[in-house]
From Swiss-Prot:
Location of region: Disordered: 1-63, 132-176
GO terms under cellular component: chromatin; nucleus
Localization terms from the record: Nucleus
Principal subcellular localization: nucleus
Superkingdom assignment: Eukaryota
Residue numbers bearing the Phosphoserine modification: 32
Family: Belongs to the bZIP family. PAR subfamily.
Name of this chain's protein: Thyrotroph embryonic factor
Functional description taken from the UniProt entry: Transcription factor that binds to and transactivates the TSHB promoter. Binds to a minimal DNA-binding sequence 5'-[TC][AG][AG]TTA[TC][AG]-3'.
Boundaries of every bZIP domain copy: 233-296
InterPro entries on file: bZIP, bZIP_sf, PAR_bZIP
Gene name as annotated: TEF
UniProt biased composition (Low complexity): 133-160
């Protein structure tokens, strides 16, 4: 019997139940088996949008690293290098600053002595490498060993300094010693004690010979001889003038020496008093040092 549409109904299997058929169950099993394969393909070949996002993230990370490196370089060198500057030399704006050459060489690890530098230049490459390795190996020991060796070095340095201090100093020339003495003589006396046309007399440095300090012998004056006017000829007056000049010269020399001796003696008296006061102060200091040493010896034993 046909329905209104004129079509025919498909034949119905009388044994088929209301649930799904065997074809549907087989399709579900096929889908569950192909799911891991699809996931693996997606992981190996991601979509285009995901790849673009990943590439953009990588580029952004590289840009951030480059910006950080540039900021670090700028902070490390805030000023342009000196070879980029042009310094005009006009004699006024150019100022040369002081630089300690030894300190600069020490900071850069360059030997200061030319002998050491020449020795290193003449050495072959193998020996230089051996020296560098030896220096690195000596610098690498732990801090405990350095702490052990440092006191011995300090002790040896202190012992050498003590030996140098204990050595007897070289003798001092007494002529080079100057004592601080408040001595200001009268300038007029200095002029009278100076040789005319020569240097000004210096009582601090001037020294007399032994013959100058000896008392001069008394010379008896010759008896006066009366010469009448008739015998006073030209020869007589010439001899008389020569005698007067010689007498005046001897008197001036004697007075000059007397003035020099007087001023020099005044200075020596002042210097002697100053030296006596210094010696008294030194004796006091020596007495204090002796008391300190005696107290130390009574407490800790002899030195």
């Amino acid at each position: 019997m046909s329905d209104a549409g004129g079509g025919k109904k498909p034949p119905v299997d009388p044994q088929a139940g209301p649930g799904p058929g065997p074809g549907r169950a087989a399709g579900e099993r096929g889908l569950s088996g192909s799911f891991p394969l699809v996931l693996k393909k997606l992981m190996e070949n991601p979509p285009r949008e995901a790849r673009l996002d990943k590439e953009k993230g990588k580029e952004k990370l590289e840009e951030d690293e480059a910006a950080a490196a540039s900021t670090m370089a700028v902070s490390a060198s805030l000023m342009p290098p000196i070879w980029d500057k042009t310094i005009p030399y006009d004699g006024e704006s150019f100022h040369l600053e002081y630089m300690d050459l030894d300190e600069f060489l020490l900071e850069n690890g360059i030997p200061a002595s030319p002998t050491h530098l020449a020795h290193n230049l003449l050495l072959p490459v193998a020996e230089l490498e051996g020296k560098e390795s030896a220096s690195s190996s000596t610098a690498s020991p732990p801090s405990s060993s350095t702490a052990i060796f440092q006191p011995s070095e300090t002790v040896s340095s202190t012992e050498s300094s003590l030996e140098k201090e204990r050595e007897t100093p070289s003798p001092i020339d007494p002529n080079c010693v100057e004592v601080d003495v408040n001595f200001n003589p009268d300038p007029a006396d200095l002029v009278l004690s100076s040789v005319p046309g020569g240097e000004l007399f210096n009582p601090r440095k001037h020294k007399f010979a032994e013959e100058d300090l000896k008392p001069q012998p008394m010379i008896k004056k010759a008896k006066k001889v009366f010469v009448p006017d008739e015998q006073k000829d030209e020869k007589y007056w010439t001899r008389r003038k020569k005698n007067n000049v010689a007498a005046k010269r001897s008197r001036d020399a004697r007075r000059l020496k007397e003035n020099q001796i007087t001023i020099r003696a005044a200075f020596l008296e002042k210097e002697n008093t100053a030296l006596r006061t210094e010696v008294a102060e030194l004796r006091k200091e020596v007495g204090k040092c002796k008391t300190i040493v005696s107290k130390y010896e009574t407490k800790y034993g002899p030195l």
